Amino acid sequence: MKKYLKDYEYKILYKRIIFTCWILLIYIFGTHIPAITTVRTYTAISNFYKMTAANVGGDYQALNVFSLGLGPWLTAMIFMTLFYYRDSDRMMKQTRREKSTKERIFTLILALIQAYFVVFTLLSHVKIDHSEKWLIILVLVTGAMILVWLSDLNMRFGIAGPMPIVMISIIRSIMRQNVALSELGPTLLISAALVLIIILLVLIFIEITEYRLPYLDVMDVSSRREHTYLAWKLNPGGSIAIMISFAAFFVLNSAVNLIVQFFNSKNNGVLNFLDFSTPIGITIFLILQLVLSYGISRLILDPKRKAKDFKKNGDFFPGVEPGKPTYHYLIHKARRISWIGAFIVTIIIGIPLYATLLIPQFSKEIYLSV
């Protein structure tokens, strides 16, 4: 019987791997279908936008069916979750279909905004009619919704949800970058390597660091006096907050440019202040990263649910009364942990981004390392 169950598990795993491979083949095939039949499109989008688009499965090197990637969906999903954060009971009462419908509508709106900005930026110097541009926008939005559907299918029948698509996109982006390490010089290479090692050690420290809150377990009647504690990671959001911040910043950039072009039709260019080549753009992005990282950490820690679990089980913290005092105690601790983790991650990302302003000739290499 045990052998039969083991063989059955391997068979299920095998089917899931095959299904994910088919999803990736469809994604790769879609990236080779151009949305416009030109040899090369002029792009006013910086290299950093191209690389960050790859982090969510997008591609701004040349317009194809899946150029928008999963950015609109990931942004919509996290903002919907943050919107219902204070009313989690209402969110729990919703059916899967209701949640999915609201996410898809929000994703469609964000995809439309992002597609408009991308098309009118990439094709600003290509002589085509406005009707053709709107047709390309329709193709991009349709491709984004198809990619969301494929990711949802892979989440149900495949492995790791949208992550295989993102990984393939990142690999394609890295292979396109022509990074000439020989031009950097030995001093700069050694300095960059030391900085990367220090950042890597800090990231490992953040990953393994836990903030422990000791509590008394009333159900523990064993004679062994083992310490029971509530363990929270310093950065529970991990890389999710960074990925979402890139997608949200690009959507913000798209929305601002769309509003400016709507009220000022003579301005067909791209606003430079929301770009990583300016200190204002980097600062706005880091503020967005700080806020989103804090919000996602609070969302994952979920002190409200923890307080309910403690009240239900009868557990309590030393010196803290059960009920509302426990809830306020957990809120205070979760707020402190979330801010500390968000500040550390923001500083780690901010240092190399501000470094691109001092040495812009190596901005591509720094963007690639980020």
UniProtKB/Swiss-Prot annotation:
The keyword Oxidoreductase does not apply. InterPro entries: SecY/SEC61-alpha, SecY2, SecY_dom_sf. It is found in: Cell membrane. GO terms for biological process: intracellular protein transmembrane transport; protein targeting. The chain crosses the membrane at residues 17-37, 65-85, 105-125, 134-154, 155-175, 188-208, 240-260, 276-296, 339-359. It holds the Pfam family SecY. GO terms for cellular component: plasma membrane. Keywords: Cell membrane, Membrane, Protein transport, Translocation, Transmembrane, Transmembrane helix, Transport. The keyword Acetylation does not apply. It is a multi-pass membrane protein. Component of the accessory SecA2/SecY2 protein translocase complex required to export cell wall proteins. May form heterotrimers with SecE and SecG subunits. Belongs to the SecY/SEC61-alpha family. SecY2 subfamily. Part of the accessory SecA2/SecY2 system specifically required for export of possible cell wall proteins. The central subunit of a protein translocation channel. This is Accessory Sec system protein translocase subunit SecY2. It comes from Staphylococcus carnosus (strain TM300). The gene is secY2.
